[in-house]
Amino acid sequence: MVDLLIPGPEGTIEAKYSHNNRDDWPIVILLHPDPTKGGTMHTKIVFKMYKIFIKAGFSTIRFNFRGVGKSEGFFDDGEGELSDAACVLDWLQQYNTNSKICWVAGFSFGGWIAMQLLMRRPEINGFVLSLIHISEPTR
């Protein structure tokens, strides 16, 4: 595992990356839950997904959205976080040019961002969404 600071739209983005030794193996980007509720790339479920994807042979990256950990910037209600995810995906693809398989996985808020990224990036051909929270029920 390598600690990274990736140039992002609002400054650097803190990330953890594990590269598979074969350049043509699949890649995956993992997205964490709501930063305003304590979500980080170290959240238990995100960390477990990270280990599972590595074991499955993926080159795997998880990162902190803007304003979390060492990532610069401020929470942007999803718009900026989508830009962060796109930037990290660009970085991942740049270092894995022979990979034909690209996945995105997200937990809660990260799942919501993952769905948006999936709709905008046709090269993504696999995804995992966990516990998507849309809104509070009305009474």
Regions found by a protein language model. Name each.
Residues 97-107:
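Alpha/beta-hydrolase fold nucleophile elbow
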Residues 34, 64-69:
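Short beta-to-alpha linker loops that shape the active-site pocket of alpha/beta-hydrolase fold enzymes
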Residues 22-58:
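Short, surface-exposed "cap/lid" segments of acyl-processing enzymes
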Residues 123-132:
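A conserved short beta-strand
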Residues 1-23:
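N-terminal cap/lid segment of alpha/beta-hydrolase-fold proteins
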Residues 132-138:
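Residue-level detector of conserved catalytic or cofactor/ligand-binding positions
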Residues 76-95:
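Alpha/beta-hydrolase active-site loop
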Residues 106-114:
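Gly/Ala-rich beta-loop-alpha elbow adjacent to hydrolase catalytic centers
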